[in-house]
């Protein structure tokens, strides 16, 4: 039987597994395509899975990706979770057990590190200070090319400097345990900072209050907050399957 894997969780979070060594149904949560969710015991861990067929593989789309995230979010309400990538499957019980066994120490360490933690996600949009600095002069083709190169390099440095300053400001405001930040220029000419913060789950309300304060302090920024989420950005994977 082929298994579709959603995430790894702590076995002791599920009373259904206390007296069983075989996969047990998890009630109240449905998987991809309405398939039954099972708790697959593996030492001190449990793998959240559902049965998977060749027909299911042909139906993997954006809706299935949303269902994948939904199942992980539901399990996150019950346990620390280590999410699998969308589309992770195992051909049979033995393959699943081997994968968990070979990564046991890594998975266990991550569960310990992320227990009681949650991820908050911030999107911050600001005007790009470099968006309208183009100069209009009479240059030869060669001069124009070199000038464009210099201006492009200057704009990139200024953009990076502004992104660093803003990310430092965000760090000081929210004081996360860890963070992952990406920055890119949008088609509109504005700059987008995509920020993932790892925090203690018990401080979510405090974090939300800080967000409310930040939206009033940073008038030149458009901010959007989501979470708490499973710690997607903070699970360090060392194998293709997990």
Language model region names:
Residues 1-242:
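An interfacial alpha-helical scaffold signature
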